[in-house]
């Protein structure tokens, strides 16, 4: 073997790779290049316009996968409608639009996103259009396959995207376009980062909501179109409330979720402000509004006047009709979209919305249709015992001879209660009988002032022909209350002025035996600094002074500043009691007369001081024992409005809020939407009706 041949063999052994000139060499290069390219994984986004700015929000992972499956299903994909966001929105694939299902909302644009660029004024990434994203993807595939980079792509709006390498891709926005001679300026603005695939951009993508819905809650807003200090709508605030509930289910009902006992609670908003102000009343108000302090007057017309609208017979009817019809409509639509739903329904109201729901609930009828025949009707025991006919009433008044007159005029007992002195005179009733009749029904109204609080806070007579018409004599307007298509299980009131409105209407107390005709539970939840909130329990038990139930912190125990405050209070009380006891003993010994012998006086003082000190100790012990006895042995009776349970529940203020109550007053009235403590109480009470409890009871 020659030296040249041996050298060639060594080269071949040391470098086993094929020669670049061979055909197999090209095939290997193409295989390596093509294998390094992987198609991009798309993710679906929708666009929300907030403050005239477009914000692209990703669908959760489950919804995005459903949209992608529908997109790749075939030719009919453009006709597909995919429910998203727990069934609250529908995406029309052909239109690439997202529509709200249960409420009115402007549709949102939907995109199948693969390529993104960083926005101008923030660090949020904006997706390219689907068509241009496909151009970028094709160019990227060629660059990776052929290993040829620094490719320039011009977008439809004449912007330049440069692919330097897989890690560096930039977007240039030209400062000036072509001039009048057709020449194009080469000056470019600040480059913006370009990313391929949603996994390469900073964005939070949630896993999605459980498919199983255990309970449905309707949420009614208060005055005005805005529900918090950020001027957000009821839809946005309820979205926050729902998000908090999903997080709390994972942290406080983890065992039940792992055992697949529970799914989630659906919260749906009910809007009555827009239908009310679409009646043309805003135009009428604008004509009489003074031109000065325009913004303040506009705010007043749009918000505070809602309270006066509710006290107007015309607009009160519009409000209750809107709330009831909206809840019935949404409930029917919800059942159509969720045919397997077997859970219960509850309602929640914030501020004035809670009063609207309170009045609607008190004017419902049970399934039999006769409220007075059911246990727990609005009438008191005295009123139920006096549920006589018109003939019996006239017989008691010794006016039986006028029965035929009333029958001829088709006046029944309820209609007679509505008659005035002039009406009776026109029917030919003499002055004496007229006074007897009017005095009789006036006395009945005054005697029933407590037993029908929910019936618009006054004595209410229910017509036999139409049980929804109310005769109200102490301030509440007379309207026809619609019937709900379901029986709510629990009524939650957030920051509610119900107690104040009932008092203003002339109601001083609530019958302890009263309960809603169709609703079993009632929780009055409020922040201690909320200027709009009022208590309910003192109206049920006016002779007893007691504190509301303190809502536990969602992380357990009380807030540290509250525990510290209670500890200091107890310490000061102990010091005060000890000091007073010492001063009392010294004063008694000082005012006691002198004894003949010093020793005798000392022994006498000792013998008297011992029972006194023991009595002081026993008194101190007695002063410390009653709170324990009240909590354990003597539960407070607050009537049947909440099934015998407590009604008033107060939140714990935050440490910073305790420094100045007035500074946080307005915020306290709007804090419920994002309050974990409020949401956890709602979830706890709802799931208790299903036999599901917290993983660990809160203290």
Curated annotation (Swiss-Prot):
Coiled coil: none annotated. The keyword Lipid metabolism applies. Residues 1-25, 599-635 are annotated as: Disordered. The active site is at residue 351. It catalyses: a triacylglycerol + H2O = a diacylglycerol + a fatty acid + H(+); a diacylglycerol + H2O = a monoacylglycerol + a fatty acid + H(+); a 1,3-diacylglycerol + H2O = a 1-acylglycerol + a fatty acid + H(+); a 1-acylglycerol + H2O = glycerol + a fatty acid + H(+). InterPro entries: DDHD_dom (IPR004177), SAM (IPR001660), SAM/pointed_sf (IPR013761), WWE_dom (IPR004170). Diacylglycerol (DAG) and triacylglycerol (TAG) lipase that is required for proper lipid homeostasis in the central nervous system. It cooperates with PNPLA2/ATGL in neuronal TAG catabolism and hydrolyzes sn-1,3-DAG downstream of PNPLA2/ATGL. In vitro, also acts as a phospholipase that hydrolyzes preferentially phosphatidic acids, including 1,2-dioleoyl-sn-phosphatidic acid, phosphatidylcholine and phosphatidylethanolamine. Belongs to the PA-PLA1 family. This is Triacylglycerol hydrolase DDHD2. The gene is Ddhd2.
